[in-house]
């Protein structure tokens, strides 16, 4: 049995890609997209029809060019998501514009709009996850959306405070980042020789997983942002793992046994009182890595969102 199939015995595998052909090839349960992945996929010739449809939608929407571009951009994200859903049995994650990361109300409005666009294509909200950055405002927005039956995936999650706040808000799923945490520490104090058990990104996800299971939080933990297969194998047993096509390929080509590493704890603890906004901001602020990586992640997604909009504007 190859390692990918071995992991699938213990963990739901999700494809971290906007490339529909790759998704079909690796047969994941779910798929995640973001502006960076959509920008990459939009440059591929085989997806030209999805872009043309989004452009036509933007023109039909009317208004200023800026409004038409915004309409086309939302439609493009949904077009990719709808196409991906034809190839997977589960859900696709579609991201809210990163520039709304500090605006609770506009994030809620955008999420409802994206769900509405999916519903116009006959796709039920039960097959969609709305991705939001795990800022305090994003977490509050997600808490409200969950009450409306719109499930959310909280991304750019680097600190334990972010994870705990998401669980306390009743968020459906979180995406703690492994690789970007590893990158930050590796740039400052390289882990040489590399020992996966000491990888700070792996340790972060393990701690979150254990805490959620011990306190009976139902929020799904989906490890994300991997740099090497060792990180993935060390988190086998995590609820879900979202993996890029190049690492899915590596795992599929290796015929080695896979051992479950994460197992729900039999120890149970009472849940603490929910964090206040001030407590969340203080705890998150204590983690220099998390503060830096969350800010950087939002900026990078915003840059790629603008590039995507420039690409669409040139065609309008």
UniProtKB/Swiss-Prot annotation:
Instruction: Show the active-site residues.
Output: 131
Sorted alphabetically, the Gene Ontology cellular component annotations on this record are: cytosol
Q: What class of enzyme is it?
A: transferase
The processes (GO biological process) annotated in the record are: carbohydrate metabolic process; pentose-phosphate shunt
Molecular functions per Gene Ontology? transaldolase activity
Q: Which PROSITE patterns match?
A: TRANSALDOLASE_1 (PS01054)
Q: What is its EC number?
A: 2.2.1.2
Q: In which pathway does it act?
A: Carbohydrate degradation; pentose phosphate pathway; D-glyceraldehyde 3-phosphate and beta-D-fructose 6-phosphate from D-ribose 5-phosphate and D-xylulose 5-phosphate (non-oxidative stage): step 2/3
Catalytic reaction annotation: D-sedoheptulose 7-phosphate + D-glyceraldehyde 3-phosphate = D-erythrose 4-phosphate + beta-D-fructose 6-phosphate
- InterPro entries in alphabetical order: Aldolase_TIM, TAL/FSA, Transaldolase_1, Transaldolase_AS
Keyword Aminoacyl-tRNA synthetase belongs to the record: no
**Keywords noted in UniProt:** Cytoplasm, Pentose shunt, Schiff base, Transferase
Where found, per UniProt? Cytoplasm
Name the predominant localization: cytoplasm
State whether keyword Transferase applies: yes
Subunit-level organization? Homodimer.
The record describes the protein's role as: Transaldolase is important for the balance of metabolites in the pentose-phosphate pathway.
Task: Tell me its family.
Answer: Belongs to the transaldolase family. Type 1 subfamily.
Q: NCBIfam families from the xrefs?
A: PRK12346.1 (NF009001), talAB (TIGR00874)
List the protein's name: Transaldolase 2
Q: Whose protein is this, by species?
A: Salmonella paratyphi A (strain ATCC 9150 / SARB42)
Instruction: Give me the gene this protein comes from.
Output: tal2
């Amino acid at each position: 049995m190859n390692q990918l199939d071995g992991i699938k015995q213990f963990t739901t595998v999700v494809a971290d890609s906007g490339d529909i052909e790759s998704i079909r090839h690796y047969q994941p349960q779910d798929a995640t997209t973001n502006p960076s992945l959509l920008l990459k996929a939009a440059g591929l010739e085989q997806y030209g029809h999805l872009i043309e449809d989004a452009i036509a939608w933007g023109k039909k929407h009317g208004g200023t060019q800026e409004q038409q571009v915004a309409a086309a951009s939302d439609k493009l994200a949904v077009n990719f998501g709808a196409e991906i859903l034809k190839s997977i049995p589960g859900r696709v994650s579609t991201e809210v514009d990163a520039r709304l990361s500090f605006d609770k109300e506009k994030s809620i409005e955008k999420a409802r709009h994206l769900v509405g666009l999916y519903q116009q294509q006959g796709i039920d909200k039960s097959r969609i996850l709305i991705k939001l950055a795990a800022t305090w405002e994003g977490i509050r927005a997600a808490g409200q959306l969950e009450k409306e039956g719109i499930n959310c995936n909280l991304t750019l999650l680097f600190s334990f405070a972010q994870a705990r706040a998401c669980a306390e808000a009743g968020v459906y799923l979180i995406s703690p980042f492994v690789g970007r945490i590893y990158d930050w520490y590796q740039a400052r104090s390289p882990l040489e020789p590399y020992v996966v058990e000491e990888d700070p990104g792996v340790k972060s996800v393990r701690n979150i997983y254990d805490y959620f299971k011990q306190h009976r939080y139902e929020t799904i933990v989906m490890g994300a942002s991997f740099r090497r297969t060792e990180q993935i194998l060390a988190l086998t047993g995590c609820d879900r793992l979202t993996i890029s096509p190049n690492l899915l390929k590596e795992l599929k080509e290796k015929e080695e046994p896979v051992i479950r590493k994460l197992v729900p704890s039999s120890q149970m603890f009472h849940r603490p009182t929910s964090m206040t906004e001030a407590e969340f901001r203080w705890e998150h602020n204590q983690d220099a890595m998390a503060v830096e990586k969350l800010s950087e992640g939002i900026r990078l997604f915003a840059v790629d969102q603008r590039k995507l909009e420039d690409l669409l504007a040139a065609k309008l």
